[in-house]
Amino acid sequence: MHRLDARSKDAREAPARAAPPQGTQDLLFEAARRLRRCEAALARVFEQHGFAEVIPPSIESAEVFAEAAGGGADALRAVDRQGHLLALRADFTAQVARIAATRLSGMSPLRLYYRGSVVRESSAESGVPRERLQAGCELVGEAGPGADAEMLALAAASLHALGIEPGAARIAVGTVGYFSALIAAAGASERLARALTDAIDRKDLPGLTLLCTREVPPGKARDALVMLAQPPRTQAEASALLSRAQQLSPGPEAAAALQRLASALEAAQARSLGAEIEVDLGEVRGLGYYTGLVFNLYAAGAPRAVGGGGRYDTLLGRFGDPRPAVGFSLDLDALVPLARPG
């Protein structure tokens, strides 16, 4: 009690230290209860689908996060007394991949889930919090469209477990494999690939058209790249979109990526997901990290995606255990205010 009183006095005398660091927050009382209810609801649905929880450490070798999407550039780093470069947890998937590759090697398939916070550096101007609350699942050792469909179905079930009805849930599905094949066929440099990714991600059709006209040689690859800035299509409209994309495929790699996406969509449709599926070939984030299926989750009332994931078949190999994997994470900061868990 005396220590608490002393700390309170120190806080009053030093108001700069009284607030949590920029981009973080205290969760008190009802906010804490709501978060725990949501986490419990998600844990139930994950375990009902055969997933087991793993709890990675909150601090890792910085090298682990160098394998994450973005290369770990936004990880908060520190050097310990032995001179080791460490980082606060910036990405759960990289940690789960490390666990699967080093602790659970040879066990397939693995169905693992997690919940907790990640910490990433961000500027005050961006409005993006440094600390973000997440929960998610990873399926390791399964490569087929059935595994992709399983994760899409579990993502939809997760939203439903939080009280988000099917009519208020939407999953935008694409494949980074098609975009990778297009930029390879176009001979795009890293600089051009980044510029194309940015224009496609913003759905900037005029800007993308101008960029392609100036820097991409005429041909199927250029026409297909421009098409990627089009709005998402409903699943009912997807066949026409995929057919057009196939016609513009500059080679077998692009065609194969589209076929894998079509197979995953067919398998997902057979599962009656309980969420509206949209096909968005402009889902091109995570180039160099994701290898096939990519998707974002949306909920009515949220201004941005509330989760996302995809297939990352090369990540475990970077830890010495090459196995395919697919997974997703949920943004609990965005979902908890919307949730009505049962």
Where do the language-model regions lie?
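Beta-rich nucleic-acid/ligand-interaction surfaces
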Residues: 56-73, 170-184, 283-291
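TRNA-binding/sensing appendages of the translation machinery
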Residues: 1-94, 149
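Short acidic (Asp/Glu) and glycine-rich catalytic loops that position anionic groups and cofactors
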Residues: 20-22, 72-75, 204, 220, ...
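Acidic, His- and aromatic-enriched active-site or binding-groove loops in soluble protein domains
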Residues: 74-82, 187-212, 273
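Positively charged, Gly/Ser-enriched RNA/tRNA-binding surfaces
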Residues: 2, 31-32, 37-49, 60-61, ...
